[in-house]
């Protein structure tokens, strides 16, 4: 039986970087509060390796992020630093750890950020590497179903569905920036404050999960509704 009060959750203090937005600065606070409340058991991940990243991302892009050399090193956040680089490597390693824990326990989490806008050759929108596609790449024998709920659609993840046959993307997003639709990419746009439509789309996604019976479901939780 799954104990929902002690979910094993990937987190490292190196997730922190003093970014211009709270995107990476907030992560230690979230992890500490969740642990103090007894909801999670924090587990230290290993940073993702260059070889693993190059399975899904262009080598020149990966090297640019690792070294800080070239304009691509700034494409996600508009700046580069060593703690930013170390943070995104740890966060993506956390996604791999969370996937393994979920396959063992039935549920797991990663106190991370910044995956779904990252495409094979570049990042963007505060997303550097696509840790969702990375999980699918390293678990080729199972279908990985991404349920993405964010104001912006998972356009980077949708790009990866073209090249990873075991990756499925279902984006529930706002009416602005959205992902493309394809054989394994579904997009449902929700008008502002239309709670009923949002619930209808969520039920559609859950029904599809029941039909497809993927080996792993990843909930990509957007932070756009959060104010404070």
Identify the residue ranges that each predicted region occupies:
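HDAC/HDAC-like amidohydrolase catalytic core signature
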Residues: 1-228
